[in-house]
C-alpha cells in the first residue's frame, strides 16, 4: 500500500513562523504510511493574472511546480496567520493560481483558522474548494 501524500503549505513568509513550525512538526510526527512534503516556495510565485493562465501560454515555472505537487498529493494542508483580518497575500496568490487549475478542484484541503475574523472567509473558500476540511 502506498503512503498517503500530504502537501503542507505555510501561509507565512516569516523565517521564524509558528505556522511553518507547526507544519514541520506535522512532517516529523506523521505516522507511518503518511508522507508530508512542506512547500517552501510561496514567495517565488508571480502575482496571479488570468491573462497568464491560458492554455496557449506557458505557465511560470513556480506555478507549474506547485500545481504538479498538488496533483501528486492526496491532500493539501494549510497553516496560516491572519494579516489585516484576512488571508496573507502570498497565500491568497497561491490559491488563486491553484483555483484556476482544474487539477485542484478534487484535492481535499485542510486548514486551521485560529482567529474568529478569518471565519468570514470560510464560506467563499468552501465554494472554491468543495473538499475543504476545517480543523
Where are these regions (language model features)?
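Short, conserved loop/helix-junction motifs that constitute active-site signature segments
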Residues: 101-105
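N-terminal beta1-alpha1-beta2 submodule of the flavodoxin-like/Rossmannoid cofactor-binding fold
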Residues: 1-80, 84-96
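Beta-hairpin (beta-strand-turn-beta-strand) motif
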Residues: 82-83, 100, 114-116
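Short, glycine-/small-residue-rich phosphate/pyrophosphate-handling segment
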Residues: 18, 107-135
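Short, electropositive alpha-helical surface patch
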Residues: 91-100, 130-135
